[in-house]
Amino acid sequence: MSAKGGAIKDKWKMKKWYSVITPKAFGEVSLGSTPAYDITQTIGRRVETTLYDLTGDFSQVYVHLYFKIIGNEGDRLITRFVGHELSRDYLRSLIRRKSSKINSIFDVTTKDGYVVRVKGLVLTTYKCHQSQKTAIRKIINETVSKKASELSFDDFTQEVVFGRLANEIFEAAKKIYPLRKAEIEKTKVLKVPENLGKQVESSSVSSG
C-alpha cells in the first residue's frame, strides 16, 4: 500500500460515526449514521428518507422526506423537518389524457411562526373550464393557509405528509368539478422562528 493510501485510510479511521434521529413529531426514529472528525461538521447536513422507512407502510414509499441536522444531544444528531416531495414516478402515474392538472404554489405561516412554501396539486376526471380551475386553485390556497394558521409546525407537517390535508382539499374541490386526486406535491421550509434558531444553537454548544 502506498503512503498516500495509508494516510487516507488512517484519516477515515479517525472519523467518528454519529446517529441521526428524526424530530419527535416523526417518532425520533434513527435515520442511520453519518461520519465526521468533529460533531460540529455535521451541522447543516441534509438527510433524505421516505415515509415508508419511518412507518413500514409500503404504500407510503413515494413520499420523500428531508431533514436537516441542527444540533446534537451527546452523540445523537438532532434534525428538523425541512420539506417533502412526492416521487416523480408517482406523479407521472397520476397523469391522464383529457383531464386537467391544477397546480398552486404559495407560502403559508404556521401558528408558531414557521414559513412554508407549498405546492398543491389537483387532477380532475375530465377537462374543466378555466373558471373552474381558478375556483379549485382558490380552494387549495384557502384550505392550506387556514390549516397552517391553526396548527403548530409539527402538527401541520403531519397533516401534509400523511395526506390528511390533501383529503380536505379533495372533499372541498370536488364540489366544483369531479376529481381524481388531490395531493400536496411538495413543501419547503423557508423560515423558522428566530427564537427557535437561537435555542437550537445554544443546545448544540452545550451538548458538544
From Swiss-Prot:
GO terms for molecular function: structural constituent of ribosome. It comes from the Archaea. Keywords: Ribonucleoprotein, Ribosomal protein. One of its GO terms (biological process) is translation. SMART domains: Ribosomal_S3Ae (SM01397). One of its GO terms (cellular component) is cytosol. Pfam families: Ribosomal_S3Ae (PF01015). HAMAP family: Ribosomal_eS1. Belongs to the eukaryotic ribosomal protein eS1 family. This is Small ribosomal subunit protein eS1. The gene is rps3ae.
